[in-house]
Amino acid sequence: MQPLHTLLALLPLCRSTTALLAFPGAEGFGANAVGGRGGDVYVVTNLEDSGEGSLRDAVSETDRIVVFAVGGVINIEDRLVVSKRVTILGQTAPGDGITVYGNGWSFSNADDAIVRYIRVRMGRGGDSGKDGITIAEGSNMIFDHVSVSWGRDETFSISGTAENITVQDSIIAQGLETHSCGGLMQTDGGVSLFRNLYIDNKTRNPKVKGVNEFTNNVVYNWGGGGGYIAGDSSGQSFGNYFISGPSTSVTAFTRGNENFHGYVENNYYDPDQDGTLNGNELGVSSSNYGGMDIVDTKYDYPAAQYIMTPDEAVSYVTENVGASLVRDGVDSNLIDQVLSYGTDGALISDEDDFGGVGDLDGGETPTDTDGDGIPDDVETQLGTDPNIADSTEIDSSTGYSWLEVWANSLVPEGYASTRKC
């Protein structure tokens, strides 16, 4: 068990605390998602597809905080449909954590979802024409350190009337051919994409329409479409790095038009596939950004607290993104591709072409006498009672429940925690 960080370290850094963050380090449009705070704790106790103690059962009801007493691969046949106000804390799983394999997830209308440190691997056996993760409606959601791969349609898509969504520190990878798309980000309700890795998707890395902020992302080895920009939009892009790979056939930004209004700053493109990170800044001109209408003034969107240089973003992303508390073989191989700087990478049509989902160490189930989701030894450190189910009580010094205090302590706060105000 990792030692608990001090409670002071869990406080949001350098920003107003009038609205509680989903967790320390949450940023962007979805930063204040509530999740299941105030609801019940559900402990996932097995790796079954359904039934009592399963993840499917855990997310089937509203107002729940989901933690894990097991680690490993959960094989699912049908899509997982997540209810409103659910927190999924994958970092609480023992061993190598949790991978959900075999089909995708729907977060449509899953208002206030908080999802952290989990792997969603759809695969060839998933529903044809469906995404790894879909959000078509709903508001106030944040996805942090999530690894999503092998979508049959898109890998991670946000569209329709969805609003106030953040995807941060995550991997969106290897949409399966013949479609092979990173995903749509098409909503006027606001999407923040901060410090993510898009890799081995032929197109839509991502496809943006509407209100969007795209900051410190790395896009690697796209095929015929890097950053798609289309339609009536107001977006901005800061400090991203596009790195061509063996499959890349077009420049970084494509398909823009005069209805796409964008503020751009310090975005880099490395086209030469020579094994060295040596790209250059894309000049601020419409021709470098797919024909978009370049604007001179930043939009007043909820920005990343710190904006890295593109080189810093590559270092951060390769070290930290995805379900990185324990990186599985899939994510490790993807990161190795990025670090080849153009010489390795491929578009795939079947996950078996990349070695499949692999195995995970399930770890040991911790003792939790009162069944409230917090192991007994941690309750002793926190000062709570291991014999009384008190994990949903609020710690007055942070505003989070004791369960959240513990879960937050298991993982780094993110890039902002390493910086000074």
From Swiss-Prot:
Keyword terms, alphabetized = Calcium, Carbohydrate metabolism, Cell wall biogenesis/degradation, Glycoprotein, Lyase, Metal-binding, Polysaccharide degradation, Secreted, Signal
Q: Where is the composition biased (Acidic residues)?
A: 367-376
Q: What's the catalysed reaction?
A: Eliminative cleavage of (1->4)-alpha-D-galacturonan to give oligosaccharides with 4-deoxy-alpha-D-galact-4-enuronosyl groups at their non-reducing ends
Superkingdom as given in the UniProt entry: Eukaryota
Binding positions (Ca(2+)): D270, D272, D274, T276, E281
Disordered as annotated region, ranges: 353-376
| Annotated GO CC locations | extracellular region
> Which GO MF terms are attached to this record?
metal ion binding; pectate lyase activity
Q: Which residues form the EF-hand domain?
A: 257-292
Q: What is its EC number?
A: 4.2.2.2
Q: How is the cofactor bound?
A: Binds 1 Ca(2+) ion per subunit.
Entry coiled-coil feature ranges: none
Q: What positions does UniProt annotate as the active site of this protein?
A: R204
Q: Which residues are glycosylated?
A: N164, N201
Cleavable signal peptide: 1-19
Give the protein's cofactors. Ca(2+)
Cited function: Pectinolytic enzyme consist of four classes of enzymes: pectin lyase, polygalacturonase, pectin methylesterase and rhamnogalacturonase. Among pectinolytic enzymes, pectin lyase is the most important in depolymerization of pectin, since it cleaves internal glycosidic bonds of highly methylated pectins. Favors pectate, the anion, over pectin, the methyl ester.
Please state which protein family the record places this protein in.
Belongs to the polysaccharide lyase 1 family.
Q: What is this protein called?
A: Probable pectate lyase C
Species this chain originates from: Emericella nidulans (strain FGSC A4 / ATCC 38163 / CBS 112.46 / NRRL 194 / M139)
